[in-house]
Amino acid sequence: MAVGRNNTIVTKFILLGLSDHPQMKIFLFMLFLGLYLLTLAWNLSLIALIKMDSHLHMPMYFFLSNLSFLDICYVSSTAPKMLSDIITEQKTISFVGCATQYFVFCGMGLTECFLLAAMAYDRYAAICNPLLYTVLISHTLCLKMVVGAYVGGFLSSFIETYSVYQHDFCGPYMINHFFCDLPPVLALSCSDTFTSEVVTFIVSVVVGIVSVLVVLISYGYIVAAVVKISSATGRTKAFSTCASHLTAVTLFYGSGFFMYMRPSSSYSLNRDKVVSIFYALVIPVVNPIIYSFRNKEIKNAMRKAMERDPGISHGGPFIFMTLG
């Protein structure tokens, strides 16, 4: 438990959410429920498809299935509570629950940073060293990179969470957000937040810069290798292979850097809520679309699954997304 002003024990916070207008509540609930269900349906479908089709048992799709799992956990750390708060008057969250929510949300996000870097290295190995690909990207190495991503992500998240939630907080303990994100929680602190801001910035820089450097170096080598390909068809195929990953990287890192790698004086809680919706709810639902829309192997795997079980064609929106 944290200590508030006058040595009172802080046991809970109140999440103000996005809007108090009754008409907006219904619209927001339907919108975010739809996004959450689509995220679950599309990512679970992608995981199941990769597991069922032996042609997709490759490092690239091993990483992709882990990314889908991460996105499910990532959005589930905030969406259920947010949906519950929209339709009920009980918008409180315990101090421990708030800290846990931020720890899981931050841990999943930082883990995704490392995983996207691992996926960039995988693309580098596949395009720049195709003959040595199975040697460079072995199953053991894939497991080590995924485990390392989780360890690095959640260790970094623990450091951030501890530095933030050790503060004294001022009443009335109202968080102007729909989940326990960093800026609105720090805004309630009665004590100096400089150290926490420095710690958070350092963690964000280390994780962000390291993972971005891996991505940039990998794609630097990829571009150098692709321009040497004499066939225009070969160049197009190589670039299209990387386009989906680059799109996902740009969306994720761009929104993350905007939120967490800037001075606290530039925070605008109302504006940041909109940005938070994008990286907390929208990115997890568009990732499977980005990776599947132009992926022939996933489309072929889906067609085979539909041929084996025609009932799959009525199984959800993922079918139309992959084959449309």
UniProtKB/Swiss-Prot annotation:
PANTHER family registered for this protein in UniProt: OLFACTORY RECEPTOR
Q: List the disulfide bonds.
A: C98-C190
Extracellular side, ranges: 1-26, 77-100, 156-197, 260-272
Q: Which gene encodes it?
A: OR5A2
Say which family it is in: Belongs to the G-protein coupled receptor 1 family.
- Name the predominant localization: membrane
Q: Origin organism of this chain?
A: Homo sapiens (Human)
Q: Which residues lie on this side of the membrane: Cytoplasmic?
A: 48-55, 122-134, 219-238, 294-324
The residues that cross the membrane are: 27-47, 56-76, 101-121, 135-155, 198-218, 239-259, 273-293
| Subcellular compartments | Cell membrane
- The protein here is known as Olfactory receptor 5A2
GO molecular function terms noted in the UniProt entry: G protein-coupled receptor activity; odorant binding; olfactory receptor activity
Residues linked to a glycan: N6
